[in-house]
Amino acid sequence: MRSWGSYRRGVVLLAALTLLWRGWTISRWSWDSDDWIYLADTESLGFWEYLWQDYNGHLMPAEFLVSWVVTKAAPLNFWLPVALASAGNVWLWGRALAALAGERLVLLAPLGLLALTPLMIRPTIWWASSLQALPLQITLALMVTAAARLARGGGRRDLAGLLLALVVGLLFWQKALLLVIPT
């Protein structure tokens, strides 16, 4: 039985479980290597210099913008933004799966795997890693949604959404360029 209401409730439930699961696991962790550098650089570098720095050969202004905002708002407390981004990631993948295959309850199984997999613990408890892994997943979910709509006869708005998602992903990490190879 297909029901958008049931599917939507399932996605919201999985996003809420992800928020709790990631919040709990992350709150029991401490900062790691690059995390301390990110934190120190928010104080030692100017705002624009911090955003546009060459960090080990990487240009990641959106990543550093998020890091700067979180550090200024709540220094040493990155668990809430990571947990919220993880839950948002699940919600966006719920939309992407529905765009690909329709609002089917069976899609909650792979979404649940994404939401609760232990494979995402390490990338999300390490602040610097989560600033790269989560935006890539979110970018891919947005691109899949836009590409599915384009394939079904979407217009310029969906094409613009696809390109905008890629640009935002690239501002977080240049490896987002690899997301367009499958499309």
Question: What do these predicted regions represent?
Answer:
Residues 158-173, 179-182:
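Membrane-interface alpha helices of multi-pass inner-membrane proteins
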